Amino acid sequence: VRTRSIITAASILSTLNVLSAEPTDTIAAGSLGEVTVTGSAARQRLASTQIGAEQLELSRLARLPAMFGENDLIRSISLMPGVHGEGDGAGGFEVRGGTSSQNLVRLDGITLYNPSHVMGIFSTFNDNAVGRATLYKGPIPSEYGGATASVLETSLANGDLEKYDASATIGILAAKVMASGPVVKDRLSFAATARRSYVDAFLQMVPQYRSTVMNFYDVTAKLHYTPRRGDHLDVSFIAGRDNMAIKRVMGMYWGNVGASVDWLTRRGERLVFATTGSFTNYSPDMRMSMAGTDQKLTEYVRNFSLTEKVGITLSDSHRLEAGLSSELLRVKSAEMEYGDHRELDIRSGWENSVWVAYDGTFAERFSVASGVRLNLYSVMSGRPFRKFEAMAEPTPDYRPENYFSVEPRISLKYDITQLHNIKAGFGLSSQNLHAIRSSSTSFPFDRYALTSNVVKPERAVQYGIGYAGMTADGMFDWSAEGYYKSLRNVYDYQDGRTMFSQVNIESIILGGRGRSYGLEFMFRKNVGRLTGWISYTLSRTRTRIPGINDGRWYDASNDRRHDLSLAAVFRLSDRWSLSGSWIFSSGQPLTAPDVKYELDGTTCYYYSQRNGYRTPPVHRLDLSATWTRPGRHFDTQWSFGIYNAYCRYNPYIVYFEDDPSKPSGTRAVQQSLFGLVPSISYTIKL
């Protein structure tokens, strides 16, 4: 198989490169939650018992180079060890060999699906809305369920109870505003953000793209009420939508709408109760017009959840927490329309859990964070779809079924000295919402399927061990962790099948086993004019599914053998700061044809193995400079950036075609999204 690179961007997004089109940035000191970067951050990491947990320093992430001028939480955490982004054109992140769909992403208790805009260029997280963020990539704490890879727990920033704040940012492609402050002083506050792109305006300037639609918006809002000290009631809301289309040819639309209510109350100094109710609706939609026939694929994922938990402080060194949760899931796995024909498949499931967790320290040096989660998932009846007879699809056999699991989880820490410790952990987890993406398409869509009497719950067992240390002044800290994870009931499409093949997903997927193992290293500099870190991950992820690859183990599509990240921030003066990041990762596994042949005038390819080849490695350098001017009434900031500074064309899509120079040959063609992209934005903060 011969390869060549086509150094051009995809048709729509190449216009953005030509126009140097960039959206927004924001003042680092006030956007992602102000945190003073000192040695205390290293001490907090060292003190944590939980293995594989990252309490994200949002102020530091805000100073990293921004893609298209936009600070991005998800792209920033992709610089952490054991985490890597899905790549250009995809906005998810993958943790320790898991896929992006195996992560639980929550905002104030609201579950978010596919949290990205414009095929991953931006994430759903508006940087000036987020107040806190924690990533759990090791054994997940017992209070979380529904994820076998990681949990990203975030929360919207509360409005100030005493003073008003506001900011506005304008870039070439998007603008955003933020406002917060008291409604009732010392009792009730609000915080709201809004962001809207105007890519369409630039596309209208180019005649060949006037029929193209590309825009997104998102809004967040939060009310924070404190009736008395220690108690609070929070009401949160988020909504976002993407629209990408070429009129009369194709269209892709997706978005999240969610809301939550959280009530926390204290009873004395040792007892805390928390009640959270939330709702999410995620709705992707794809439409095409081919050969005079309109085709449409729509989905939705809706969940309603209620959680009650209680925390008991037994002593200064011992804490107990218990809780229960109930979640109702309703999924339209697919609704397909082919001209006048229509078929759909809707499923429902009910998941109930109870958990207990304990954190404690013994003999000053030994700490434990342990717990167990009991989970009962009930398969509920589905709505039979209207069959498209020409496809001869069998009617699925909907049968109620119950799945029960016991999921123990534990993390242990032993302090060798005050500056060095070792950790170990073990955890079981399960997932009943399956998202399966075709490896043959780069669209940001998955086919969703609930656990049924045919599709079994995904199960994961993870083991971890690590070492961490720091200098006495907190200037430097470092860590090393190793992990091994095994999975059961991992699903992939049958050979020759894609997400569009049939509505009944059970008939086009197969289940099997997976395993992932690796080593992670991290070194940080926390104090001084120059701060930053370097992280490296050596890992392997493999899958074995009967009926695929002759039942042999093969590299998973998200396997990355080597993953290296460097990030640095240099404070040049009180007004100027410089930052840069560089990433390198091994190429993505790829299924390539071994033989081609003609059948009735059509070229067909024969594939002997799944993911037997790899795309070229991915590497990129990003740079930025920020100038801030404090003022009497408001502060201003100019941000300048260069994405992909040495113009590396990383693979976005690789497909195969006949080699015109050799009729019997085949060549691989690579397409890339972005070359060198400059950015500029202006922010004003009251």
Language-model regions, residue ranges each:
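Surface-exposed extracellular loop regions of Gram-negative outer-membrane beta-barrel proteins
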Residues: 283, 330-335, 378-390, 414, ...
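Signature of Gram-negative outer-membrane beta-barrel scaffolds
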Residues: 326-421, 432-433, 548-551
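C-terminal beta-signal and adjacent terminal beta-strands/loops
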Residues: 575, 584-601, 616-620, 626-686
